[in-house]
Regions:
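Internal alpha-helical scaffold of NAD(P)-dependent oxidoreductase catalytic cores
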Residues: 17, 21-25, 44-131
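Short, small-residue-enriched loops and turns at beta-alpha junctions
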Residues: 6-8, 79-81, 143
Length: 169
């Protein structure tokens, strides 16, 4: 499964959906500031693989680590999944703010306060606070979430410009 956020049907964790709907029992979540076009152009990047099972992290690290891609491991599966969901939401809000031409100061407020709230939510869900200041949180938000071509950023702009509602899962 290659996805981020929460399951659109249930609002639950995607890793739980994989476990429920497949024979897989040892799952992980990958996140980080990795734009597909930059990865394909072999530009340097880093990501984190989180799993409750060390071997999932080890296998993923061995498969993806290269001279241009640094792969870190974590056991904070819920933190990485929560950070991924929050980055999606914050990207949408940043797109809305940019469409309203509110400026970089407001973007700074959205990023800093959004990450603070994401961390609080994560702690309530048994995540580790440092995950949100790492690759899966601030790293992903800076590189991907605030990128004009990010789908959720574009959704946020569309909500303001076109007045249409967009489902963000």
């Amino acid at each position: 499964l290659a996805s981020r956020g929460l399951c659109p049907e249930s609002g639950g964790w995607l890793s739980d959906q994989v476990i429920t709907r497949s024979a897989c029992r040892r799952v992980g979540a990958i996140s980080g500031p990795t734009l597909a076009a930059e990865v394909m152009a072999r530009r340097p990047c880093a990501l984190v693989i989180a799993s409750l099972f060390d071997e999932v992290g080890d296998i993923t690290q061995k498969a993806l680590h290269s001279s241009v891609c640094r792969v870190y491991t974590s056991r904070d599966l819920r933190g990485v999944e929560t950070a991924g969901a929050m980055v999606e939401m914050l990207a949408c809000v940043i797109g809305m703010a940019d469409a309203l031409q509110l400026g970089l100061s407001v973007r700074g407020v959205i990023v800093s306060r959004g990450l603070a709230e994401a961390t609080r939510l994560g702690l309530a869900l048994d995540a580790e606070a440092h995950t949100f200041s790492g690759l899966a949180g601030v790293g992903d938000l800076v590189a991907c979430g605030a990128h004009p071509k990010h789908p959720r950023y574009q959704d946020g702009r569309s909500m303001v410009k076109g007045g249409r509602s967009v489902r963000v899962a």
